[in-house]
Amino acid sequence: MQRIDLFGAAAAFETVRMPDGTEAAIPTEHAAVIYVNEQPAFRVVCTPQLLPQLALGRLLTEGWIASAEEVEQIAVCAEGLKVNLYLNHPLTARRAAAQEVSSCCTDNVALGSPVEVQPLRAVPHLDVQPGWVDALAAAMSAGLPLYQATHAVHSCFVLHEGRILCACEDIGRHNALDKAVGSVLLAGVPLSECVLYTSGRVPMDMVRKAIRAGVPALVSKTMPTVQSLELAAEYGLQLLCGRKHPLTSSKSAG
């Protein structure tokens, strides 16, 4: 896969004088449009870093592609306003009318004619060791640089074979997860061997992203919903939630 990034990154936060005279580090927002085969696909509002990773991860977790092997090139313009992904095949459009679907996280929307997305498939099993969850929780508690500066962003860590492979930050939890997934894809590491740890909530859309990424387990310091537990159980995703007492992807009526 060829990668052309003329943008790189911009300042993720600015120091702002508050009304009471104190100064605070405030995160910045960056808007970009992700194009697939020259057609607009998503508008994202994100932290202005790791745009190739965000775009690649977004295509996988939203079901537009089944693997990174379908992507021939990722190109980011100098201003970071346009991210182009070129596939080795045309996209198959749905028969339904086009819609814009807003995300509950930041101001992200899907653009243009929807495509036939990849169906959800059962994820592989992985024996998640208790020490792995502890290591992820410790890393999350320590905080990443942008969070330490602003306390206003989400994080997503990737664990591979017991070691933290990468960690990504963004103003949106969906974006942070997509950046982490994209980073793993660009590194050539099998997602089937990875565990994701998100700082955000895990409703159905986050569980769906993890399933489409093909990871065996998703860990969060927050609690899931009944529906996200059911979806995780249906496709074999280990859902480990809660600071002290992680839940499995099973549930009991109450």
Question: Over which residues does each language-model region extend?
Answer:
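Intrinsically disordered, low-complexity regions enriched in acidic/Ser/Thr/Pro/Gln residues
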Residues: M1-E161, C166-A167
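Short glycine/serine/threonine-biased micro-segments
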Residues: A55, D170, T198
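Short beta-strand-to-turn element immediately C-terminal to the catalytic PLP-Schiff-base lysine
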Residues: L159, S250-S252
